[in-house]
UniProtKB/Swiss-Prot annotation:
Disulfide bonds join 42-105. It comes from the Eukaryota. It is a lipid-anchor; GPI-anchor. SMART domains: X8. Gene3D superfamilies: 1.20.58.1040. It comes from Arabidopsis thaliana. This is PLASMODESMATA CALLOSE-BINDING PROTEIN 5. GO terms for cellular component: plasma membrane; plasmodesma; side of membrane. The gene is PDCB5. Residues 1-29 form the signal peptide. Residues 158-180 form a propeptide.
Length: 180
């Protein structure tokens, strides 16, 4: 399909207007200091060895002070056939109790943060949204629905990220306009 000159110009103007509007929103967010809140969970990595995970569980439940009751026999997260699942619950508990610091979700590089809720069946993982300075709230969110932006959470937006996204969008739109 070949566009006539007026159609092409109209498309370019539409793209420029959309880009300008997007950059205004990004700039407003950056200047306004708005922070995006996201629910996060600390979970065991898929490629972690079971023996490494078991060692990490033992440390976290002992010296680390994590609440390991739910992974004990009869607990809702106990599954001796799935060490990764049990490690994920313990890692997440430790992470929340330690103020959601990045270092609290490492376990010798066997853990990572995710925004996907790992809860399964009766095994419910509290999220970063329900944590309050390292203490889990009584009404801990289980992350079943949309994130509640009015309470705690982990800020993931910073001015450099917003600037990076805006600049990348501007470059992309400039390339598209140039190649029409």
């Amino acid at each position: 399909m070949i566009m006539s000159l007026p159609q092409c110009s109209h498309l370019r103007l539409s793209i420029l207007a959309a880009t300008a509007a997007m950059l205004m929103v990004i700039t407003t967010a950056q200047i306004g200091g708005q922070v995006i809140q996201v629910e996060l969970w600390c979970v065991a990595k898929n490629n972690a060895e079971d023996s490494s995970l078991q060692t990490a569980i033992e440390w976290a439940c002992g010296q680390g002070g994590a609440d390991c009751g739910p992974i004990q026999q009869g607990g809702p997260c106990n599954d001796p056939t799935d060490v990764q699942k049990m490690a994920s619950f313990v890692f997440n508990n430790y992470y929340l109790k330690n103020g959601e610091e990045d270092e609290a979700c490492n376990f010798n590089n066997n853990a990572a943060l995710t925004s996907l809720n790992p809860s399964q069946g009766t095994c419910k993982y509290p999220s970063s949204k329900g944590a309050n300075n390292g203490r889990l709230a009584d009404d801990t969110s289980m992350g079943a629905g949309q994130a509640d932006m009015s309470r705690g959470g982990r800020p993931i937006s910073s001015s450099w990220m917003v600037t990076f996204i805006g600049f990348g969008s501007l470059l992309t739109m400039t390339w598209i306009i140039h190649h029409l």
